[in-house]
Amino acid sequence: NQVDGIAAISRRDAIDFEKLGSKKPKLIIPFGINLDVYTPVINENPQLNFFHLGSMDWTPNIEGLNWFLDEIWPEINRKFPKSHFYLAGRDMPEDFYKRKSPNVHIVGEVEDAKNFINSNSIMIVPLLSGGGIRVKIIEGMALGKAIISTAVGAEGLHYKNKKNIWIANKVDDFIKAINYFNEDLQNINKMGLSARALAESDYNE
């Protein structure tokens, strides 16, 4: 109660402050990025390769990726054995390097995040907890990426499910999403272009 007001970057965060008992005025300030520095590279022949990029010293990322690799990836790999998953981020825990998950590549820290994102097809955001705005999702949208995310991962974002992002909370949801992309690989680009359009309309500084 030592402040005159609270600025939150999402409605969820504003509600969380209220749950903590704050009666102060709240202002939601949407997050934005300069799209001029995000140039999508559209692959004319997209493939079923997946990626995650995020700080690996953040507990929700570790929790979500362990869940994804333990519960979701084995089924994806069984149904789509030619697919690959590339996991990148700074401060990668040693446990991830020790994993023996098939077709999972632990990249670690990358020099150029935009180049890494542009070199892959489908962003995976398997968050189960955590607040704030998922900056990496907005960056992925800005670079024209198809994105599969849990509902928690997409909290605070404006989106239309299955148009500019695909929400998946359990293994069947992920399989349905990947089936959609696999039926026509151009659907990867279709959703990515829709995501870019959303970034331009809602998240451009």
Regions found by a protein language model. Give the residues of each.
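Conserved catalytic-core segment of nucleotide-activated headgroup transferases in glycan assembly
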Residues: 28-119
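Short hydrophobic beta-strand element within catalytic cores of glycosyltransferases
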Residues: 136-139, 146-150
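Short acidic/histidine- and often glycine-rich active-site loop of Leloir-type glycosyltransferases
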Residues: 151-162, 166-167
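Conserved acidic donor-binding segment of nucleotide-sugar-dependent glycosyltransferases
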Residues: 165-172, 180-185
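Alpha-helix capping/helix-boundary segments
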Residues: 12-14, 92-93, 153-154
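Acidic donor-binding loop of glycosyltransferase active sites
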Residues: 4, 118-132, 143-146
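A short, well-ordered alpha-helix in the C-terminal region of glycosyltransferases
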Residues: 180, 187-201
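Donor nucleotide-sugar binding/catalytic pocket of nucleotide-sugar-dependent glycosyltransferases
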Residues: 1-40
